């Protein structure tokens, strides 16, 4: 993943819009996110454990006074132009619908924006399950409100970004991605109860190990995937559990002990497996956080592996690419934990690998993956960073 520098971003902004004077121009950054454990639990009111990445989306912005928005991106060829008076979803605007949706949601809150000229640059791969959509949404929301002198707290902005994806884009995302992008902290993972929004910043002390993200290079189109189908299956499971316990509001309330008692009411085997994953994954998150706090990194790694197996066997969201990576990485040199991360159906895995074995790990996994799948994966040795902020820039 490339490193961005403020001077380069300002130059690109000036060239993209033929601007001679860079006055009143500001730069903001929102990270991508990687979820260490706790997958497909966020929309079920369960626990998640994500962290903000040091890679993400940069936004260079200059306010206008004509109610127009002129958008360009280093990552896409198309430019997007629209007005405050026309904030409708438009398929031809493609990626531009994400910032447009944010502006539309802010307008619903009564926020009167003057228009803006905006340039984006992202260094997280799109469709890889590292929350490029939450990243561009949060950087747009945070940057626009900061430039306009409007004080909206980060939790409210995260909820606004979730509404944008749900209502404007049409993807039923949970709140985890936006929350992690907004509330991330360097070298910490975010233990979040997605029902109450109570959270704890837990230090990620890797003691000679590194986080390695492996991109399967199979793009994962979230809106076109079976994400919404899984969400509906969980809703069906919850409805059936309520036959025995009527006061359940979400699956995140169901402990393993409760499921042992209530589970048999679910007669459909597929629905039963979907619910079982959510219940056991919540338990794994709690155990993983406890293991990290106790310095038990090996235990944390084993829980990561168990998470992937549940996502494969009970939730059916892995696929041949992610399963191939998992099988190779679980036995690769220096790897003590690995799992798919994100919604699945392609995208990435996250692994904990000893820093002295990273090259050997990558070699073994790359060769095995290419032999079976036909093309190579891409590796990113990464760390956890801060949430959305005004960016002061590199060199």
From Swiss-Prot:
PROSITE patterns: GALACTOKINASE, GHMP_KINASES_ATP. ATP binds at residues 73, 127-133. GO terms for biological process: galactose metabolic process. GO terms for cellular component: cytosol. The keyword Metal-binding applies. Its EC number is 2.7.1.6. The active site is at 177 (proton acceptor). Pfam families: GalKase_gal_bdg (PF10509), GHMP_kinases_C (PF08544), GHMP_kinases_N (PF00288). Mg(2+) binds at residues 133, 165. It comes from the Bacteria. Belongs to the GHMP kinase family. GalK subfamily. Catalyzes the transfer of the gamma-phosphate of ATP to D-galactose to form alpha-D-galactose-1-phosphate (Gal-1-P). This is Galactokinase. It comes from Halalkalibacterium halodurans (strain ATCC BAA-125 / DSM 18197 / FERM 7344 / JCM 9153 / C-125).
